[in-house]
Curated annotation (Swiss-Prot):
Identification of the protein by name: Transmembrane O-methyltransferase homolog
Main location: cytoplasm
PANTHER family the UniProt entry points to: CATECHOL O-METHYLTRANSFERASE 1-RELATED (PTHR43836), TRANSMEMBRANE O-METHYLTRANSFERASE (PTHR43836:SF1)
Signal peptide (from-to): none
PROSITE patterns: SAM_OMT_I
Stored InterPro entries: SAM-dependent_MTases_sf, SAM_O-MeTrfase
Assembly and interaction partners: Interacts with LHFPL5, PCDH15, TMC1, TMC2 and TMIE. Interacts directly with TMC1. The interaction of TOMT with TMC1 and TMC2 is required for the transportation of TMC1/2 into the stereocilia of hair cells.
Location(s) in or outside the cell: Cytoplasm; Endoplasmic reticulum
Annotated TM spans: none
EC number(s) on file: 2.1.1.6
Enzyme class: transferase
Amino acid sequence: MSPAIALAFLPLVVTLLVRYRHHFRLLVRTVLLRSFRDCLSGLRIEERAFSYVITHALPGDPGHILTTLDHWSSCCEYLSHMGPIKGQILMRLVEEKAPACVLELGTHCGYSTLLIARALPPGSRLLTVERDSRTAAVAEKVIRLAGFDEQMVELIAGSSEEVIPRLRAQHQLNRADLVLLAHRPRYYLRDLQLLEAHALLPHGATVLADHVLFPGAPRFLQYTKSCGRYRCRLHHTSLPDFPAIKDGIAQLTYTGPG
């Protein structure tokens, strides 16, 4: 490319960098720096986060563990977790619905799992599914460190596509009063339809889906609005530590087959 052509594109490049500067910062923190630290330490980000938690958080205090994870994500390495603002929305909805049984798809480091478990009424049960075995091992430690036993919070390592059909037979889950989709948005529609197909959603069940605006789940949103089985509401929010990057949590109420 000649210098003249390169100069012609310079204003466009500068404009894009300015407009998407927050997205560029996010890319640097979540991809470039994370990959570098993974190679340098031989540990994944979730494992490094747990090393910080185990030395700074109070065992048996889920609130303090959550605050410790927030601090580590803001000051050390960006964790790509739900964060305190979305977390308040999640806890409020769990407290309002008071579900007897909750299914979470996408445990990650256990952050949202602790939020749900804190807000559940006595006697309720939470099943959380994490595809990656190393991440699941970290989340298991976080959950137990917070003081939640296996009777209340059961972690299942495996892909949601394989786990959902086995929930009734292998994990005695006959119905999920509340479901949190917090794994990869491209799988939201597939997994929602699996839950429908296996009759795991009772009438009035609540389905919450994170990251429906960023990175986005357009096919999932289109389906839930057009299939006639859900009442839909969107809670507008943003990414933790990146208030300029807008996101949202979809709240669905299952009304039965259309």
